[in-house]
A protein has these predicted regions:
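Short acidic/histidine- and often glycine-rich active-site loop of Leloir-type glycosyltransferases
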Residues: 630-641
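Short alpha-helix at the nucleotide-sugar/activated-sugar donor binding site of glycosyltransferases
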Residues: 613-615, 638
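Short glycine/serine-rich donor-binding loops of glycosyltransferases
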Residues: 609-610, 633
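Alpha-helical solenoid repeat scaffolds of the TPR/TPR-like class and their adjacent stem/linker regions
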Residues: 1-518, 536, 565-572, 584-597, ...
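A short structural motif in glycosyltransferase catalytic domains
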Residues: 601-603
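Short hydrophobic "strand-cap" motifs at the C-terminus of beta-strands
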Residues: 355, 524-525, 553, 580
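Catalytic cores of eukaryotic secretory-pathway lumenal/extracellular enzymes that build
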Residues: 577, 582-583
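Glycosyltransferase donor-sugar binding loop
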Residues: 386-391, 549-562
C-alpha cells in the first residue's frame, strides 16, 4: 500500500505549534497537536506529540486510546498493546478498544489473548457487526474453524451485505473441507459483486475440490475476460487444466502466467510437472530447480530426484544428486536424534513398521498385499503400518484387515509421527516410497527406529545415512553392479517382491501376429517414462521390420504428443502407431491381446508394467544401463528365465527384435506357456518374499543387537523354511 501524500500543516496544527512555543509545558496543546497530526496521517509526528503530552501530564490517560491505533498503524505492536491495555484500564467497557487490542494481539501471534479480547468486545457490542467480525477473524487465525464459522455467520446475520465476512466464511468452510458450503458463499459474493476476482479464484478452487473442474475452467475463463492479464487467475486455470489432463493447454497457460509476473514455486512446480509428463525433461528440471531455489523443501527435492531418476544416465551425477538430499535435509536433524531403548535380544518378537502413502489402488499395494497377508501369521513379527494418505479405498480396507495396528499419519508432522513410532517401540522401520510423492524421508532422517530400510517404492537410494538397508534381490541389484550408488547396504533376498496378478486379467490370447500377418510391438508405460532416446531406438527396430506396427497404451489427453513427434522425427509415420487411451485395469490387460512383444523404456525401465505383460503372455525386450533404475525390468524377466530378452546395446536390441519377428512359432509357444513359467518361478510364490523378508529382518536385527554397523546381507532360497507357498529348492 502506498503511503498517503504528505499534508502540510493545517491552520489548526499551526495554531497548536504557536501555543506550544508560547507554553511548551502545556500538555493539552501537545495533545491537540498530536490528534490533528494523526488526522492528516502524519503518524510519526502525531505519536511523538501524544507521548509528549502524556509525559507532561499522566492524568491525560484517555489519550492512550488515540495513541494505540496509531502505534499499531506504525507497526509498533508491543507499544500498541501496552497503550491499549492502559486505555482499557480507564475505559473497561469500550468495545472498540478491546477489538483494537485483539487485532494487535492477533497480528503479534498471541492468539489466545486475541480471542479473549475479541470475546470481551463482542460481549460489549453484540449487535455491532464490525466488532463481531473481530472475534471471527481471531478464531480463524487460531485454527478454531468451527467456532470461526459460527462467528462469521453471526456477523452476516447482523450485516447480510458484508462481503468480506461472506468471503471469510467461505475460506473458513474450505478449512473445514466443506467445499460445497464454501462455494455457496463465493457464489453469493459474485451475485453481488460480479467482478470480484478473489471470489472467482476461491470458487474455482472449491469446484475443483468437488470434481467439477470443467465448471471451474469456465469460471476462470469468465474472470479472465475481466482481467485478461491476471497472472494468478492464469495460474489457477493452468492448475485446473493440469488436473483435467489437458497438459498441452496447462503448459501454455502456466507459461503465460509465468511471463506476466514472477512465478511462485507452485506455478514452477506445476509447469515442471506438465513438461515432465510431456517428455520435456530439460525444461521440467530447470523449473523444478528454480522452485527449489525459491522455496527449498524436502518434498520439492524428492520430486526433482524422481525426475532425474527417469532422465539421467550418468550414474555418478545421479548418485551425487541423491546424496545431496541427505546432506541438505538429514544433516540439520542429526543433533535432534535420540537413543533407542529397544531391548537388544536377537531372538525376541520384532515390531516392524511400514511407512507408505501408497496403500490404496497403487502398484506398491499390489506387491505388498500378499506379504502383509502372510506376515500376519508370523509368530515372530508384529506388523505396524503408518499410512500417509487420505485415500481410503477397497485396497486400503483389505490391507488394514491384515495389519490391525494401523496408524493414520497424513497431516501429522515428523515430530508427532516419531513420538508415535517410539511409543509403538518399533524395532525396524521400512520405507515403501523412496523419493516418490508423499514420502516421509525427513521422518526417517530423524532415525525414529534403531534399524531402517527402504523397499519397493523407488528404484534408487534415499540418500540418507539414517537408512541402513535397501531391500532387493540378486537379479534386481546384481552383486557389485550398483552398490556404490547407494548410501544403504544392499539386502539381497531370493525375490525383491511378489507380483499378485489382477483378478480382472483375462486369459492369455493367441499370438496376434499369426492372424495379423505382421508383428506388433507395444509399450504400456507412463508417457513420462519414455525418453527421446528410447523412441529413437524403438524406431530403428521399426525401420528394420518395415511391416511392423507399434501400440502405445496408457495415453490420455494428448500426453503422448511429444512421443508422436519423436517417432515422426525418426521417420515412423502415424499410420504405424496404434494409440490406446488409459482405461480400466481389465481393459488395459486385455489390450495385451494385440501385442506380440513389449518394449521397456530407459533409463527408467519399471517393473509393474513388465509383470502385467508377462502375466498376459507378452515378453518385454529391454536394455540395461549404468544406473539402477535401468535394471528393474530385467529383474523379473531373469526370474522367469527370460534373460535372453536383454539387449546389451542398440545393435543387439535391433537384431534381437528382428530375430523374434521372424520366429513367430517360438514367440507363440512362449506366450502359451508364460503363465506356467510365471507360477512355477519364485515370482509366483509370495511365501518366498514373506519368508525371505522375515529372515532378512532377523539378520538385520542381529547385526544391531551385536552393536555392529550395517553390512550387505544375502538370503538364499535354501535358507527358507518349506511350506505350501514355497517352490521346491
Amino acid at each position: 500500500m502506498n503511503s498517503p501524500a504528505y499534508i502540510p500543516d493545517t491552520p489548526e496544527i499551526a495554531q497548536h505549534r504557536r501555543a506550544i512555543k508560547a507554553n511548551p509545558r502545556d500538555a493539552r496543546n501537545h495533545a491537540l497537536l498530536g490528534i490533528d497530526l494523526l488526522r492528516v496521517h502524519r503518524l510519526d509526528e502525531g505519536v511523538a506529540a501524544l507521548k509528549k503530552a502524556l509525559a507532561l501530564d499522566a492524568s491525560l490517560g484517555a489519550l492512550y486510546g488515540v495513541l494505540a491505533p496509531a502505534l499499531h498503524d506504525l507497526g509498533q505492536r508491543k507499544e500498541a498493546i501496552d497503550a491499549y491495555r492502559r486505555a482499557i484500564k480507564l475505559q473497561a467497557n469500550d468495545a472498540d478498544l478491546h477489538k483494537g487490542l485483539a487485532d494487535v494481539l492477533r497480528q503479534d501471534g498471541q492468539l489466545d489473548a486475541a480471542i479473549a479480547s475479541a470475546g470481551r468486545a463482542a460481549a460489549l457490542a453484540p449487535a455491532h457487526a464490525a466488532i463481531q467480525l473481530g472475534l471471527a477473524v481471531a478464531m480463524h487465525a487460531a485454527g478454531r474453524y468451527s467456532e470461526a464459522a459460527a462467528a462469521f455467520r453471526q456477523v452476516l446475520a447482523l450485516a447480510p451485505e458484508h462481503l468480506d465476512a461472506r468471503m471469510d466464511l467461505g475460506r473458513t468452510l474450505m478449512r473445514l473441507d466443506d467445499h460445497l458450503g464454501a462455494a455457496v458463499c463465493f457464489e453469493q459474493v459474485l451475485e453481488r459483486c460480479p467482478k470480484q476476482i478473489d471470489a472467482h479464484i476461491t470458487l474455482g478452487t472449491c469446484l475443483r475440490k468437488l470434481d467439477r473442474r470443467s465448471e471451474a475452467a469456465e469460471l476462470y475463463g469468465r474472470a479472465l475476460i475481466l482481467q485478461p492479464d491476471d497472472a494468478t487467475l492464469l495460474a489457477e486455470l493452468g492448475f485446473c487444466q493440469q488436473e483435467m489432463g489437458q497438459l498441452d493447454a496447462a503448459r501454455a497457460t502456466l507459461e503465460r502466467s509465468a511471463a506476466l509476473a514472477m512465478p511462485d514455486e507452485n506455478v514452477l512446480r506445476a509447469l515442471g510437472l506438465c513438461q515432465f509428463e510431456l517428455g520435456d525433461w530439460t525444461q521440467a528440471r530447470a523449473n523444478w530447480e528454480r522452485a527449489m531455489e525459491m522455496a527449498p523443501s524436502a518434498n520439492s527435492h524428492s520430486a526433482l530426484l524422481f525426475l532425474l531418476s527417469h532422465s539421467l544416465s550418468d550414474a555418478a551425477a545421479l548418485t551425487a544428486a541423491h546424496r545431496d538430499f541427505g546432506a541438505r535435509w538429514e544433516t540439520p536433524l542429526l543433533a535432534q536424534r535420540m537413543p533407542h531403548p529397544n531391548l537388544r535380544d536377537p531372538q525376541r518378537v520384532l515390531r516392524i513398521g511400514f511407512v507408505s502413502p501408497d496403500l490404496h489402488s497403487h502398484a506398491v499395494a499390489q506387491f505388498i498385499s500378499p506379504v502383509f497377508a502372510l506376515l500376519k501369521e508370523s509368530k515372530m513379527l508384529k506388523q505396524y503400518v503408518y499410512y500417509n494418505n487420505s485415500i481410503d479405498d477397497e485396497t486400503t480396507r483389505l490391507l488394514r484387515g491384515y495389519v490391525p495396528d494401523w496408524r493414520e499419519i497424513h497431516g501429522l508432522d515428523d515430530v508427532a509421527v516419531e513420538e508415535l513410532i517410539r511409543a509403538d517401540a518399533i524395532d525396524i522401520l521400512i520405507d515403501l516410497a523412496g523419493h516418490s510423492a508423499l514420502n516421509r524421508l525427513t521422518l526417517f532422517a530423524r532415525k525414529p527406529a534403531p534399524v531402517q530400510a527402504s523397499w519397493i517404492g523407488y528404484a534408487g537410494s534415499t540418500g540418507l545415512q539414517a537408512m541402513d538397508y535397501y531391500l532387493a534381490d540378486q537379479f534386481y541389484l546384481p552383486q557389485g553392479r550398483y552398490d556404490d550408488q547407494f548410501c544403504e547396504k544392499i539386502v539381497r533376498m531370493p525375490l525383491i517382491a511378489p507380483f499378485l496378478p489382477h483378478a480382472a486379467a483375462p486369459e492369455v490370447s493367441p499370438l496376434p501376429a499369426l492372424a495379423n500377418g505382421h508383428i506388433t510391438f507395444g509399450s504400456f508405460h507412463r508417457a513420462n517414462k519414455v525418453s527421446r532416446d528410447a523412441v529413437a531406438l524403438w524406431s530403428k527396430l521399426l525401420r528394420a521390420v518395415p511391416d511392423a506396427k507399434m501400440l502405445i497404451g496408457g495415453t490420455y489427453n494428448n500426453n503422448e504428443a511429444a512421443m508422436l513427434r519423436w517417432f515422426e522425427e525418426q521417420g515412423i509415420g502415424r499410420e504405424r502407431l496404434i494409440l490406446r487411451e488409459r482405461t480400466t485395469m481389465g481393459k488395459y490387460l486385455a489390450q495385451h491381446a494385440d501385442v506380440d512383444i513389449c518394449f521397456s523404456p530407459f533409463p527408467y525401465t519399471g517393473a509393474t508394467t513388465v509383470c502385467h505383460a508377462l502375466w498376459m503372455g507378452v515378453p518385454t525386450l529391454t536394455t540395461i544401463g549404468p544406473t539402477n533404475p535401468s535394471h528393474a525390468a530385467l529383474g523379473y524377466l531373469a526370474h522367469l528365465g527370460l534373460s535372453s530378452f536383454l539387449a546389451d546395446d542398440d545393435a543387439s536390441f535391433v537384431n534381437l527384435g528382428v530375430f523374434l519377428s521372424q520366429n513367430l512359432p517360438t514367440l507363440a509357444a512362449l506366450r502359451a506357456g508364460m503363465r506356467e513359467r510365471f507360477t512355477s518361478s519364485v515370482v509366483g510364490y509370495p511365501g518366498v518374499v514373506a519368508a525371505g523378508l522375515e529372515l532378512a529382518l532377523r539378520k538385520m536385527w542381529m547385526q544391531w543387537c551385536d552393536g555392529k554397523t550395517p553390512e550387505a546381507i544375502r538370503v538364499h532360497l535354501a535358507e527358507l523354511s518349506g511350506g505350501q507357498d514355497m517352490p521346491a529348492t
